[in-house]
Amino acid sequence: MSVYTERVAELVQREVARILQREYADRLQPMVTITRARVTGDLSIAYLYASVMGDTAEEREATFRQLESLADEIRNQLASRIRHKVREIPELKFFHDESLEEAKRMENLFDRIREERERRLEDGEDSADARE
């Protein structure tokens, strides 16, 4: 990616995040965070990675589908904010960023491993005490 496309990607990410926070916070529940953005070399498409916070997978999926349905509306608002900074307003394509969910799964896995080790250590100590 060229320096210009990187700057445009950063600008799009920042402005879309602001738009979501200020204009759509009440409509997009639970909270949506734009974690990353990439822009094609010709600046025609912006790929936005969104993390959706929610208690259930169904809730997160419904919010993400709603976000996708708002893409054109968000693009229009983006255009009014950045049209003087870029030659073309890119089409917005949203992707579900599961990195936070994956991190949570990994943390839970490590917790289970830690608990299993502690249990084995306790069992080992109990066995050693019984032999004495």
From Swiss-Prot:
Q: What is its main location?
A: cytoplasm
Q: Any idea where this protein resides? A: Cytoplasm
Q: Name one GO molecular function term.
A: ribosomal small subunit binding
What's a BP term from Gene Ontology annotated to this protein? maturation of SSU-rRNA
Q: Which UniProt keywords apply?
A: Cytoplasm, Ribosome biogenesis
Report which residue ranges the record marks as coiled coil.
none
Q: Name one Pfam family in it.
A: RBFA
Report the GO terms under cellular component: cytosol
Q: How is the subunit organization of this protein annotated in UniProt?
A: Monomer. Binds 30S ribosomal subunits, but not 50S ribosomal subunits or 70S ribosomes.
What is the documented function of this protein?
One of several proteins that assist in the late maturation steps of the functional core of the 30S ribosomal subunit. Associates with free 30S ribosomal subunits (but not with 30S subunits that are part of 70S ribosomes or polysomes). Required for efficient processing of 16S rRNA. May interact with the 5'-terminal helix region of 16S rRNA.
HAMAP family, sorted: RbfA
- What is stated as this protein's family in its record? Belongs to the RbfA family.
Q: Which NCBIfam families match?
A: rbfA
Name of this chain's protein: Ribosome-binding factor A
Q: Which organism is it from?
A: Salinibacter ruber (strain DSM 13855 / M31)
The organism that produces this protein has a lineage beginning with: Bacteria, Pseudomonadati, Rhodothermota, Rhodothermia, Rhodothermales
Q: Which gene encodes it?
A: rbfA
